[in-house]
Amino acid sequence: KKDGYPIQENGCKY
């Protein structure tokens, strides 16, 4: 997972 906004439960957009 990286900085940004969450799109999934396992990661983010960025």
Curated annotation (Swiss-Prot):
The free-text domain note is:
Has the structural arrangement of an alpha-helix connected to antiparallel beta-sheets by disulfide bonds (CS-alpha/beta).
Q: What is this protein called?
A: Beta-toxin Cn9
List cellular component terms (GO): extracellular region
Keyword match Secreted: yes
Its primary localisation, in coarse terms, equals secreted
| Location in the cell | Secreted
Gene Ontology terms, MF aspect: ion channel inhibitor activity; sodium channel regulator activity; toxin activity
InterPro entries per record: LCN-type_CS_alpha_beta_dom
Expressed, tissue-wise, as follows:
Expressed by the venom gland.
Q: Does the keyword Transmembrane apply?
A: no
**LCN-type CS-alpha/beta domain: residues covered:** 2-14
Q: How is it modified after translation?
A: Contains 4 disulfide bonds.
Could you say which protein family the record assigns here? Belongs to the long (4 C-C) scorpion toxin superfamily. Sodium channel inhibitor family. Beta subfamily.
The record lists the organism as: Centruroides noxius (Mexican scorpion)
Key words of the record = Disulfide bond, Ion channel impairing toxin, Neurotoxin, Secreted, Toxin, Voltage-gated sodium channel impairing toxin
